[in-house]
């Protein structure tokens, strides 16, 4: 059983440094992978790929793409697991971005 999930969230924030953008992307990936492996044993996962894209324009767009493949005998709702992982990742990213925004206000 395999599945993919993708969502784009628009976040209006001050400019982020390249380092902060990388940090945000890595955070999203870590949260997704942690959630999957909190729910499944490593041996239950045939393949997992988490791709993060961050585009800067008028808004900051974060796109998370998750590919998860598990053996047929593993009883898990892959779609739901991915949705939960992505929701947690976006919540963690939003929290991190608020921290960054607050740091910027403190320096001003």
From Swiss-Prot:
Pfam families: DUF3194. InterPro entries: DUF3194, MTH677-like_sf. Belongs to the UPF0440 family. This is Uncharacterized protein TK0644.
């Amino acid at each position: 059983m395999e599945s993919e999930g993708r969502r784009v969230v628009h976040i209006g924030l001050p400019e982020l440094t390249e380092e902060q953008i990388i940090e945000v992307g890595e955070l999203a990936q870590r949260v997704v992978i942690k959630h999957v492996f909190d729910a499944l044993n490593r041996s239950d996962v045939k393949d997992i790929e988490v791709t993060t894209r961050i585009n800067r324009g008028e808004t900051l767009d974060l796109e998370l793409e998750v590919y998860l493949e598990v053996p047929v005998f593993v009883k898990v709702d892959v779609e739901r697991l991915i949705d939960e992982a992505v929701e947690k990742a976006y919540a963690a990213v939003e929290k991190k971005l608020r921290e960054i925004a607050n740091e910027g206000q403190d320096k001003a």
